[in-house]
Amino acid sequence: MMVRFDGVSFSYACAGAPALRDLSCSFAAGQVTWLFGKLGAGSSTLLLASGGFAPILTGGHRTGSVRIGELDPGDIANRAVLAGRIGYVSAQPHLQLSGLAETVFDEVAFAPANLGWDRERIDAAVMHALARVGAGHLVRRVPNELSGGELQRVVIAAMLVLAPEIWLLDEPASALDPATRAGAYALFREEARRGAAVVIATEDADGVLEVADRIIVLDRGQVALDGAPADVLASDACWALGVGSTTVGELWRAATERTPAMALGGVPLTLQAATAKVLRA
């Protein structure tokens, strides 16, 4: 399913400036879209509006059109139709716990049970989802006793079990170690291959660069740049916005201030690309 924004503005009740301003964009099925921007640029709000959580859960006021297919996710009348089709992972995963589950198994099974799945289907789907995020060994643990990284994997599994058509991910790997983080991004890439629209809001440029098809750079609630991640991140326009880049990209930019000749031929974003460029020099 495609998510479409057309001239959308959104303001929280107590905020002075709008979080989104006349924003238009779309997220396609089968594609990983990366939302990137400085703190307060609007990435988290864009995710919330995509799923209808803003304004239904957050309050505030939205103008313009948001559509998932032909449905407005911000219309509470459409919640039942969209239930199970949207997988949202918050930057604060502990807030997504049901508060009713005694074990990790029960937590991941919570949504399928509420959707009326039979027990056999639930059992198989829960164990498969936990295995895919490397959390099968946590199945009998108490959710509130998990570490940050363990909890993040369980929350991802709780969405994964539903095989959502749309993934809305807010810093979904922030608490994970490097190896597990790479596995999480690879999983989201697999979900896009399955046909899901995957939208990831993160500052983790090093991690998401390898899996993103597209990057949208936000600035003060508007789309500032939109294109292929390697092209956008290496551009002077992106650097001028002050949103940062990969670790290698930032180091290379800093080096060019001392040695301007290094800027010739573009900015490498990975260690492999930087090494190749140095060897060619």
What would you call each of these model-derived segments?
Residues V142-L146, E150:
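Conserved ABC ATPase signature
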Residues T202-E203:
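H-loop/switch region of ABC-family ATPase nucleotide-binding domains
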